[in-house]
């Protein structure tokens, strides 16, 4: 059974009539904050993993600049997503791994934004094996106080995983062999980056597995 915010609030009020007025108001104020709280989600990962492309796919619009050769995100880009009665802010953050100078700047930016992030979605390429920069930055965030249970790891470019030529362009889904490859990569990433949530694969440009991603993202929110 589901309730709208107004009907839920009215029902709770009826249950609290026996409490003193001051206590009742404090409970109702807290309930209002919980219901109307807008979580903030940071999207991180190496440059070129498809963070901005994932945002564009979620919003079904080219709201974030992308480029196949150059990183386009240099500052935190805030986007508001409305899902039913719930609003949330997605923060598309600049990707690491381009230059040591940029990484130093981004560490300062990540440190500054970390306290306000309710969830961190970390994007890794499914067709790549070099995760040293990701491991180092993940450890940096943990050392800065990030909650390890607040990370959700996503494999992008699932359509390019071996053997890429077998991607089913008609059905927009991986072949059987690609599915096996994705399972192997998923297991490896889950070992390297322990998380409370399963590792998920997506192919953002063609929309593959995006509904599952959005569902998991909502589930992962506090």
What residue ranges belong to the model's regions?
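Conserved G1/Walker A P-loop phosphate-binding module
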Residues: 2-93, 97
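Charged, alpha-helix-enriched surfaces in structured cytosolic catalytic cores
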Residues: 49, 53, 74, 105-108, ...
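Alpha-helical scaffold elements adjacent to nucleotide-binding pockets in ATP/GTP-utilizing enzyme cores
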Residues: 57, 116, 133-140, 154, ...
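Switch II of P-loop NTPase G domains
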Residues: 73-76, 93-117, 124-143
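Conserved nucleotide-binding/hydrolysis micro-motifs of P-loop NTPases
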Residues: 95-97, 127-129, 157-161, 205-208
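Conserved beta-strand segments of the P-loop GTPase G domain that flank and frequently precede/overlap
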Residues: 121-126, 153-156, 201
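A short helix->loop->beta-strand "cap" motif at the edges of active sites that frequently abuts
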Residues: 146-151
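Canonical P-loop GTPase G-domain recognition
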Residues: 159-222
